[in-house]
């Protein structure tokens, strides 16, 4: 047997061996993204609890800090998802994660706007008299935008679950939920 024939016969077996030993890139990507989303879902739950306490007794430093923390949380999550290698990953999975990142980038921008607004209130000035209740009213005006982002995120959750079922069947293994689990915000938005 000459070298080219040997390589032609061995190459498929070598590729199969590497795939088994290294794991499927889609499964690896999926699990890493799911781990990131689980971690940041838990962090967002803690942040929402803090915001609920602030809603009952608003303080400008607390509002500014919470909006900064929300923006930081979403930024860190986005950076971690962006750092994942997409080489040889199923395009449907990477497309979902990209759409998810774009949606939550809007949430991050909103949190950054609130942070800047509260910073101005903290500094005071002719246009910004430090008044927590007025600052909270400003949040109220953004509720509609928050609700719109959340509605789109819920639709994205449904798509993620359908994608999870499809890929689990295709790959013949159970995959963890991929989506960023949204905290319950009804009390916060009422």
Residue ranges and their predicted role:
Residues 1-20:
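Sec-dependent bacterial lipoprotein signal peptides
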Residues 5, 13, 59-62, 127, ...:
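Generic low-complexity segments that are intrinsically disordered, proline-rich and/or Lys/Arg-biased
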Residues 8, 21, 87, 172-173:
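Generic N-terminal simple sequence motifs
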Residues 9-10, 56, 102, 144, ...:
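Positively charged, low-complexity intrinsically disordered regions
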Residues 22-75, 182-186:
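Immediate post-signal-peptide N-terminus of mature secreted/exported proteins
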Residues 156-171, 178:
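Juxtamembrane amphipathic/coiled-coil helical coupling segments that flank
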């Amino acid at each position: 047997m000459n070298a080219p024939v040997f390589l032609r016969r061995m190459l498929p077996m070598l590729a199969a061996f590497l795939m088994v030993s290294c794991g499927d890139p889609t499964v690896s990507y999926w699990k890493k993204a799911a781990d990131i989303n689980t971690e940041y879902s838990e962090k967002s739950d803690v942040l929402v609890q803090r915001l609920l306490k602030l809603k009952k007794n608003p303080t400008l430093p607390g509002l500014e800090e919470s909006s900064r923390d929300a923006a930081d949380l979403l930024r860190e999550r986005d950076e971690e998802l962006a750092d994942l290698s997409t080489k040889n990953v199923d395009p449907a999975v990477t497309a979902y994660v990209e759409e998810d990142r774009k949606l939550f980038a809007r949430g991050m921008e909103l949190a950054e706007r609130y942070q800047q607004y509260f910073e101005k209130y903290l500094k005071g000035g002719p246009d910004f008299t430090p008044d927590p209740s007025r600052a909270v009213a400003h949040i109220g005006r953004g509720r509609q935008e928050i609700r719109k982002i959340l509605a789109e995120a819920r639709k994205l959750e449904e798509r993620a679950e359908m994608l999870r079922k499809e890929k689990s069947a295709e790959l013949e293994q159970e995959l963890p939920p991929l989506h960023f689990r949204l905290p319950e915000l009804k009390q916060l938005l009422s």
